[in-house]
């Protein structure tokens, strides 16, 4: 991706066992597939993300799904300053979010994006709570 900006990879270390998770859900449409979707753990948070009612996630968060080789795909995203500050304040891991970032998809995830010809229909960040052992896992620490 030829860019004016430097994109930083969002690493797995932002996912901390025992804490609530923001899940990035992407729905694809088109290509050789029908209704392909991906659920990707995005960020461990101390409390749920709540955006102002009058705004949509797309007002703060833009994604672009691009090939990163013959069989691999990256998801690039640009984050508005308001959402950037909000995510970093909620994050369990200290200040992991930057304005320009990307995620590397594994081969199986990449296959879904390729089958849909990279055509994103919709995306969302969903709050996912912890399981029954979450507090115990959290107290034992990684």
Curated annotation (Swiss-Prot):
GMP binds at residues 64-66, 117. The keyword Ligase does not apply. It is a peripheral membrane protein. Coiled coil: none annotated. It holds the Pfam family Matrix_Borna. One of its GO terms (molecular function) is structural constituent of virion. GO terms for cellular component: host cell cytoplasm; host cell plasma membrane; membrane; virion component. It is found in: Virion; Host cytoplasm; Host cell membrane. The keyword Chloroplast does not apply. Not glycosylated. Keywords: Host cell membrane, Host cytoplasm, Host membrane, Membrane, Viral matrix protein, Virion. Plays a crucial role in virion assembly and budding. Homooligomer. Homotetramer. Interacts with phosphoprotein P. Binds to ssRNA. This is Matrix protein.
